[in-house]
Amino acid sequence: MILTSISVLKDNYVWILYNDNCSCIIIDPGVSEDIIKKIEKKNWKLIAILLTHNHIDHVGGVEEIIRRYPNVTVFGPEETKTRNVNKIVKQGDVIKLLKSEIHVFLTPGHTLGHVSYYLKPYIFCGDTLFSGGCGRVFKNKFFDMYQSINFIKSLPKKTILCCSHEYTLSNLNFAMSILPFDKKIKKYYKKIKKHISQNKTSLPVSLETEKKINIFLRTNEKTIKKAMGLKKDTSSFEVFILLRKEKDDF
């Protein structure tokens, strides 16, 4: 299985998996036109669409795509059922496509029913975890988001994160405002800034890298607590809440 992506809208990524037989799967098509053009140009056969959650920049292209390719199966969580989904997925489901198994994990926090799809080594985590950051928390579900990103953190270190937005520089800027002397974050920021200036992307990224530069995956560290003026016994969850609220206002 080969991974590629299309940049759409302002900063979204649509992820595409395809095989040697030119069959493909797309994840979170926020638009239709660019995706259809790509499929036609590559002469791919679209087999399935996977949706992580019900925000328009992730589902906006579904209707037009299935109008063009009516035999496509659309998978998504319960919250996406009005988006032409014909296969509702839930925690623990295993989707068998293109001779591969795709595991479904409930990763709420950004939305109540947000899911992620795991096809080793890739995790398509939508708006749950970003490079250098995490998604906004709606409906005050901070513990849900905390659990979700820590679940992703628990995956094998060689896991490849396929996030849905190019927010990396902004996230690293925030991280440096918290930890201005962190050499790993500063070095990675310079690397990604150069990539972006060359019209390259920062994604996908390994979980191994994220554990080093993503402060939302480091909320148990004494250095972060000290930098934020918190007591040593402040819980990782409390640190996460404070970080996420500060990022909202950054």
Curated annotation (Swiss-Prot):
Record note on cofactor: Binds 2 Zn(2+) ions per subunit.
Domain of life of the organism encoding this protein: Bacteria
UniProt cross-references to InterPro entries, sorted A to Z: Clx_II_MBL, Glyoxalase_II_hydrolase, HAGH_C, Hydroxyacylglutathione_Hdrlase, Metallo-B-lactamas, RibonucZ/Hydroxyglut_hydro
Disulfide bonds: none
EC number: 3.1.2.6
CDD domains xref list: hydroxyacylglutathione_hydrolase_MBL-fold
Reaction it catalyzes: an S-(2-hydroxyacyl)glutathione + H2O = a 2-hydroxy carboxylate + glutathione + H(+)
Sites where the protein binds Zn(2+) 1: 53, 55, 110, 127
Keyword check for Membrane: no
GO biological process, one term: methylglyoxal catabolic process to D-lactate via S-lactoyl-glutathione
Pathway: Secondary metabolite metabolism; methylglyoxal degradation; (R)-lactate from methylglyoxal: step 2/2
Pfam families (UniProt xref): HAGH_C, Lactamase_B
Enzyme class: hydrolase
Listed cofactors: Zn(2+)
Binding-site residues, Zn(2+) 2: 57-58, 127, 165
Keywords: Hydrolase, Metal-binding, Zinc
Keyword presence, Transmembrane helix: no
A GO molecular-function annotation: metal ion binding
HAMAP family according to UniProt: Glyoxalase_2 (MF_01374)
Assembly description: Monomer.
Function statement: Thiolesterase that catalyzes the hydrolysis of S-D-lactoyl-glutathione to form glutathione and D-lactic acid.
Homology family: Belongs to the metallo-beta-lactamase superfamily. Glyoxalase II family.
Protein name: Hydroxyacylglutathione hydrolase
Organism: Buchnera aphidicola subsp. Schizaphis graminum (strain Sg)
Lineage: Bacteria, Pseudomonadati, Pseudomonadota, Gammaproteobacteria, Enterobacterales
